[in-house]
Regions:
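Terminal transmembrane helical module of multi-pass membrane proteins
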Residues: 126-166
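Helical transmembrane-bundle signal
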Residues: 15-19, 56-62, 88-91, 117-121, ...
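Membrane-interface helix caps and helix-loop-helix hairpins in membrane proteins
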Residues: 96-105, 126-130
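Helix-adjacent hinge/juxtasegments
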Residues: 57, 61-95, 99
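Membrane-interface loop-to-helix entry segments
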Residues: 45-57, 102-114
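Hydrophobic alpha-helical segments of small multi-pass membrane proteins
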Residues: 81-94, 107-121, 136-144
């Protein structure tokens, strides 16, 4: 069996941001987040870790397929991988802003930006490798749910007087 280290690295890379934000997220979920008015259709807290691990793994492998089939970081893959990197950076920014700083409004802006950038990345990736585009579909569906939750949280949790305005 031959291990394709590029595939392994690309698959692990997006998970790193999730792993790094886990302590901050857990602390906030056990405290501040529990005080928020949340929609009844919000998935249970224990679902988020496994779902994000699957989504990060799928998008990471999708990026490998694009890199492999699109000629590396130049040529056909350049736009798709640039958009992928941009959406990954936006994704990683959300947890510290939302869970760390408790900025619901800024979290919503980031979530909407992420949805648009990830959608553009998914389309660009599908032009290079159709399977890569399909691997991004569950992520886009989850981001759609996340955006509706973010909007609900923003609408139903006004800034607190003891906190800076969002």
């Amino acid at each position: 069996m031959v291990i394709v280290w590029e595939a392994v690295g690309a698959t692990i890379l997006p998970n790193i941001g999730g792993w790094l934000s886990t302590p901050l997220t857990i602390k906030s979920v056990k405290g501040w987040y529990k005080t928020l008015a949340r929609p009844s259709w919000t998935p249970p807290d224990y679902v988020f870790g496994p779902v994000w691990t699957c989504l990060y793994t799928g998008m990471g492998f999708a990026s490998y397929l694009v890199w492999r089939d699109g000629g590396g970081f130049s040529g056909e893959a350049k736009t798709a991988l640039t958009l992928y990197g941009a959406q990954l950076a936006i994704n990683w920014a959300w947890s510290p802003i939302f869970f760390g700083l408790h900025k619901i409004g800024a979290g919503l802006v980031i979530a909407v930006s992420l949805w648009g950038t990830a959608g553009a990345a998914a389309l660009a990736m599908s032009r290079v490798n159709q399977t890569a585009g399909l691997l991004m579909v569950p992520y886009m569906m989850w981001l759609t749910l996340a955006n509706t939750i973010s909007f609900y949280l923003w609408r139903n949790n006004p800034p607190r007087k003891d906190k800076k305005k969002e």
